[in-house]
């Protein structure tokens, strides 16, 4: 628990939160999402947002990928939902599996599609280590999805190459002196 020592007002643009394990990156993101309260001061986000935590808890374990995508998109016609799932690499069989049975990369792509393709899409997307535990093909697909996202991103990641692939230059970074905001 390390405080942000100065008041910060950040306009919405793409940002990364970086630092070593245990420094509080996920806690900062959870505060922005309204899942944790600040110990001191206040944290306020005044735009609608979507939050994908490391466990992708937004995905109902028993619901199929097809059902989830249709629910997120207010009754998207089944044929269009199946086409979108095929583009994500989920064939007709995998589209009917419960979300809990999908691989990490499949779950992440499905969760992102549910957020990005929803109407209206959230103008702010918070992602907690989306590049963890996924294969290279899924990572490249996630990078492409995020580059096409029209809203602002705040991403927690240890992977400098992933952050660079998303063209994120502004960072809230943990250093030996505490949290530092770096703008490129």
Language-model segments: what does each one mean?
Residues 1-8, 12:
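Single conserved hydrophobic/aromatic residue that forms the stacking wall/gate
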Residues 8, 48, 123-124:
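The start of beta-strands in P-loop NTPase/AAA+ ATPase cores
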Residues 14, 19-77, 158-161, 165-184:
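ABC ATPase nucleotide-binding domain signature region
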Residues 54-124, 129-132, 137-140:
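ABC-family P-loop ATPase nucleotide-binding domains
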Residues 139-150:
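Helical segment within the ABC ATPase nucleotide-binding domain
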Residues 151-156:
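Conserved H-loop
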């Amino acid at each position: 628990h390390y405080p942000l020592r100065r008041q910060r007002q950040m306009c919405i643009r793409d940002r990364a939160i970086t630092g070593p394990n245990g420094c509080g990156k996920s806690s900062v993101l959870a505060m922005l999402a309204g899942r944790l309260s600040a110990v001191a001061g206040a944290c306020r986000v005044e735009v609608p947002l979507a939050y994908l935590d490391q466990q992708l808890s937004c995905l109902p374990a028993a619901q199929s990928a097809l059902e989830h995508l249709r629910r997120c998109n207010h009754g998207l016609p089944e044929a269009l939902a199946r086409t979108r799932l095929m583009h994500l690499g989920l064939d007709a069989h995998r589209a009917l599996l419960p979300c809990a049975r999908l691989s990490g990369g499949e779950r992440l792509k499905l969760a992102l599609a549910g957020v990005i393709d929803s109407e209206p899409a959230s103008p702010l997307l918070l992602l907690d280590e989306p590049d963890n535990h996924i294969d290279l093909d899924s990572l490249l697909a996630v990078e492409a999805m995020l580059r096409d996202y029209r809203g602002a991103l705040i991403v927690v990641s240890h992977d400098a190459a992933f952050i660079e692939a998303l063209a994120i230059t502004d960072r809230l970074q943990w250093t030996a002196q505490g949290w530092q905001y770096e703008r490129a």
